[in-house]
Amino acid sequence: MNDQRKGYSRRDVLKLAAAAGAGMVLPTPLFAASGPVLSRPVPRSREMLPVVGLGTAIIFDFDSSSDTAKRAERRTVIRTLLDEGGRLIDTAPSYGRAELTLGDLLPEMGVRDRVFLATKVRATGSRDACTAEMQESLKRLRTNKLDLMQIHNVGFRDRNETTAQLDLLREWKASGVCRYIGVTHSQDQQSANDRLVDLMQREKLDFLQVNYSMAERSVEQRVLAAAADTGTAVLTNLPFARAKLFGAVRGKAVPDWAAEFDATTWGQFFLKYLLANEAVTCVIPGSDKPEYMADNLNAGRGRLPNAAMRRKMVDYITSLS
């Protein structure tokens, strides 16, 4: 197969980038379609958000005061996100030192005002405990305002508790401490999806965050449609299914027909599938290298697959398992 049509893995991208530094000419299709990263509106405000952001679980959990190598690399990841057209960074108190790392890097870089910053609060606990946790997040992030506060892994055992927590978040929103509120959920189960639909219909959420990848597609059945119907913005995490998808395609070239939607790497292939669903506001893969961050952002450029092509993509990935 001609190199200009074969597609590249992320490791290939790094190798070819090194070759470029040595003066070699790279095949043009390695690069994504030109132009700005696609943006979509937050339904309740019509604020435009770039469709690719950055998740911080595990990757930003380190001591930024002592690990200078990781600090420099993550700093470059953030710079790449912002300079290449992204905005949203998602974190949580349960992500170890991730909030502290962001609280170190964002002010130092002078980019806090360019970032759409989202964090989370526990799904259970007293009003005082939840308030204390949110206040601690502000302290760790070294900011007095957040763009999005989310109830983390919302539960369905106690409807009154969830309502009380959302009321607390609404108070924070009314006071101007956060601009949007929402919930996250990570169970890939139909029963949980049904409850999420009920929650969106009952409560006027600004955002919902769910797991969604080509390996976990249960939210396609009802959740994403309900989000669109209720005016709820959607963030999707684990878009590579914790690298399961990259494992499935290891050693394989991106199929020629991926050129029809401007995907030149597997990362773009996987993300463009998700972004083709217009209910998805922003995907938030973790990125520990600037090259990966740039590749993720390139998924938001160029064409997206249509419904028939998405079915073909699923059939192809399924055939590899």
Task: Identify the residue ranges that each predicted region occupies.
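N-terminal secretory signal peptides
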Residues: 1-8
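Short, acidic/polar
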Residues: 67-80, 127-140, 191-198, 270
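Acidic (Asp/Glu)-rich catalytic clusters
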Residues: 44-46, 103-112, 138-142, 200-201
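N-terminal export leaders
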Residues: 8-26
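Beta/alpha (TIM)-barrel catalytic core signal, keyed to glycine-rich beta->alpha loops juxtaposed to Asp/Glu
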Residues: 154-321
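Conserved, mostly hydrophobic/aromatic
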Residues: 42, 54, 89, 102, ...
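C-terminal segment of N-terminal export signals and the immediately downstream linker at the start
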Residues: 28-56, 63-66
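Active-site groove signature of glycoside hydrolases
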Residues: 141-156
